[in-house]
Structure formats: C-alpha cells, structure tokens
Amino acid sequence: CNMALADIVRLPPASEAPFAPLGAPRDLSGPPSKLAVRPWGGADLPGPGLQLLHGTTTLAFKFAHGVVVAVDSRATAGSYIASQTVQKVIEINPSLLGTMAGGAADCSFWERLLARQCRVYELRNKEPISVAAASKLLANMVYQYKGMGLSMGTMICGWDKRGPGLYYVDSEGTRIPGEAFAVGSGSSYAYGVLDGGRRPDMATDEALELARRAIFQAARRDAYSGGSVTVYHVGPRGWRRVSSHDVAGLHDGYGG
C-alpha cells in the first residue's frame, strides 16, 4: 500500500514551471491536458478525455438592403437536449451582431469580450468600429489560444460606412468575408434552401422569409437543431429583431 501511494504521489504535475502571470506561456503537457475538448475537425486526443457534441444551425447572408441573420435555439449535451431557449445571437453594439455555434461558453465569452473592445475603440476613435475591424479583432484574440480546446464558429454581421458586412470567424483564427454563411450541424440543410432562393435584389420581407424557412428545414432534418427560429435584420440604422417563432408552429406554413 505504501508503495502504491508513493507511485501516486510521484505522478508528473500538469506543469513543472511555477505559477505564471496572466498571458505568459504555460506548459500544459501533463495529464490534465487529456481533458481538453478537441477542436472542430481535429483528431481525438490520446487517452481518456471529454467527448462533447455541439449541434446548432445559424445562418446569415447579405442582400441589397442589409444583412439577414437567423438562428435556432436548441442546445445539446451529447445526445440529450439541454435547452430549447438559448439566445444564439450576441448583440455586440447597435450595428453589430455575432452568432453562436460550437461551445456556448466559448462563443458567449469571446463575443462579449469583443463587445467591450468595440466600445473601447469607439471611445478612443470617436466613431463606431467597422465590421471588418471587429471581425479581425476577434480572430486575433482567439488565434492566441489555437489548439487549446476552444470550440467556436461565429459570424460577425453588421452595417458600417461601407455598407453591409459579413465575416466568418472560428476558434482556429480563420476569418473569411462572404455573401452567405451557414454554420452548425444543420448547415448543409440550410445551404440547400439558401442556394435555391437567395438573390442580391431580394426585398426585405422576402429575405426574412427565406432565412426563416432555411432554419426551419434544418431544424426539421437535424436532430441537434430546433426550438425556435429567431430572425434579425441589420440595416443602415442598425439591427432589429424581427421575429421569433416556434419550429412546431411553422410546420404547417412551410408544408412540412
């Protein structure tokens, strides 16, 4: 028994280095690193670890009158539904929105931190931050933690002096401008609807209806998406929350 206890005591610590100040590089190569959540698309870590499944459907696209953003509201923990009422749009400032896909805590923390940094920028420069600058700021912040288990796929949507803006940013530091994105486990179903109905010259009501229908079809086919469909419109005067409908209530209207 004594030898067994000694063997346990001699287990290598998570870090041989003394406590480091915030922001300093740390060696996390010890056993606790086995509990890290693997990044999207990454290989499983060797040995026992946490296996977390993330499911959602979020989308955004640009058109002549701004940007339309639509999300579902279901959160899952593995194969179980954890919540049907998650708010997956982060209201960064009156002209900027961010979406959540991946780990809810990661998305919420980094986008709220982005909101604070955007406010600091506005106070220093006496003008609102552009969509491009806000997305670059987020990408730079999360890139410092690449490979450390963050799980985030977000869209930064807004309107600035250049017009509508839309960027995809993920936890690997990827930053891509685009006309339309769908992110999450139901994204392939949403893309099918968007690609068949999206046009640059759409009327606002038509664009809102298309986004709502795309999320509904994704929620219908993807077990990890559901709850309610919430739609936002971002225009020259900022964003507005247009509607929130329960998925079950939309079933008859879209010929389910």
From Swiss-Prot:
It is an enzyme of class 3 (hydrolase). This is Proteasome subunit beta type-5. PANTHER family: METALLOPROTEASE TLDD, PROTEASOME SUBUNIT BETA. GO terms for cellular component: cytosol; nucleus; proteasome core complex, beta-subunit complex. The active site is at T56. The lineage of its organism: Eukaryota, Metazoa, Chordata, Craniata, Vertebrata. It is found in: Cytoplasm; Nucleus. CDD domains: proteasome_beta_type_5. The 26S proteasome consists of a 20S proteasome core and two 19S regulatory subunits. The 20S proteasome core is a barrel-shaped complex made of 28 subunits that are arranged in four stacked rings. The two outer rings are each formed by seven alpha subunits, and the two inner rings are formed by seven beta subunits. The proteolytic activity is exerted by three beta-subunits PSMB5, PSMB6 and PSMB7. Directly interacts with POMP. Interacts with ABCB1 and TAP1. It catalyses: Cleavage of peptide bonds with very broad specificity. Belongs to the peptidase T1B family. InterPro entries: Ntn_hydrolases_N, Pept_T1A_subB, Proteasome_bsu_CS, Proteasome_sua/b, Proteasome_suB-type. Keywords: Cytoplasm, Hydrolase, Nucleus, Protease, Proteasome, Threonine protease, Zymogen. Its EC number is 3.4.25.1. Component of the 20S core proteasome complex involved in the proteolytic degradation of most intracellular proteins. This complex plays numerous essential roles within the cell by associating with different regulatory particles. Associated with two 19S regulatory particles, forms the 26S proteasome and thus participates in the ATP-dependent degradation of ubiquitinated proteins. GO terms for biological process: proteasome-mediated ubiquitin-dependent protein catabolic process. Residues 1-55 form a propeptide. GO terms for molecular function: endopeptidase activity; threonine-type endopeptidase activity. Pfam families: Proteasome (PF00227).
